Amino acid sequence: DQLERSHVLTAREFSAVFDQNSFRINASEFLILARKNGFTFSRLGMIISKRTTPTSVKRNLFKRLTREAFRQSKLNQIPLDIIVLGRPKTNKMTKKELLESLTVNFQLLIDQWAKPS
């Protein structure tokens, strides 16, 4: 139940974030889109294609590190639906570089959210 709650799962949920994103972090390694949701917690969705990252090992690593960076950040306390889209550069990054980049960019998202609009 907790796992289902914390993930953007359906096509409708993904479309809502794409169509109505309020927050956007455009890094060379990935794109982070987010929109406010009606919950008291964040939900995370990830998109990493075979074209972007040909090997399943690298795709799964990207997903694992994204979930880890999400858990370590304070994003789970903010009511957002978040999608992280992998780009080709993620394929060439080390674990450490990818985790650091995700951590920094999740912090930028937190800062954007905290800024009064």
Model-derived regions, located:
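Positively charged, solvent-exposed patches that mediate nucleic-acid binding
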Residues: 1-117
